[in-house]
């Protein structure tokens, strides 16, 4: 969906959106939803990081478009990937959600609440 497409249904313009957000177009996932996309991302993250689901201590999903309010999306990801020891919660902060989720995870790690997989492996 382009900015031009949006300007046909709401009072805006490509220039207005682009200058304020840098966004030119969006994708629509017709067969997917927030939960299925988050589960896929979780599985890919495990594979790319080379860790098991049992090693995961926390799952933070940043979204303002959950499929359900209960159970939250993070808990659905937790179950689907088998991260039975993880704390799981959603964080809703609209466009800045990713930054808030990342800084929350960083604070947990820095504070010693959770560890990076590499840190845990070095302690064994």
What positions do the PLM features span?
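Conserved "HGTGT" condensation-loop signature of ketosynthase/thiolase-family condensing enzymes
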Residues: 1-60, 80-81
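Active-site-adjacent elements of ketosynthase-type condensing enzymes
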Residues: 6-12, 66-76, 121-124
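Conserved catalytic cysteine-centered active-site region
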Residues: 18-20, 24-36, 64-116
């Amino acid at each position: 969906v382009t900015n031009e497409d949006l300007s046909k249904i709401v009072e805006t313009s490509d220039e207005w959106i682009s200058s304020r957000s840098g966004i030119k177009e969006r994708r629509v996932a017709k067969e997917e939803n927030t939960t299925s996309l988050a589960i896929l991302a979780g599985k890919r993250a495990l594979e790319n990081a080379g860790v098991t689901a049992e090693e995961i201590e926390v799952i933070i999903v940043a979204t303002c478009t959950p499929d359900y309010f209960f159970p939250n999306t993070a808990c659905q990801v937790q179950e689907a990937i088998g991260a039975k020891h993880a704390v799981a919660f959603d964080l809703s902060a609209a466009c800045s959600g990713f930054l808030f989720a990342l800084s929350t995870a960083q604070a947990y790690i820095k504070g010693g609440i959770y560890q990076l997989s590499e840190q845990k492996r070095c302690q064994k």
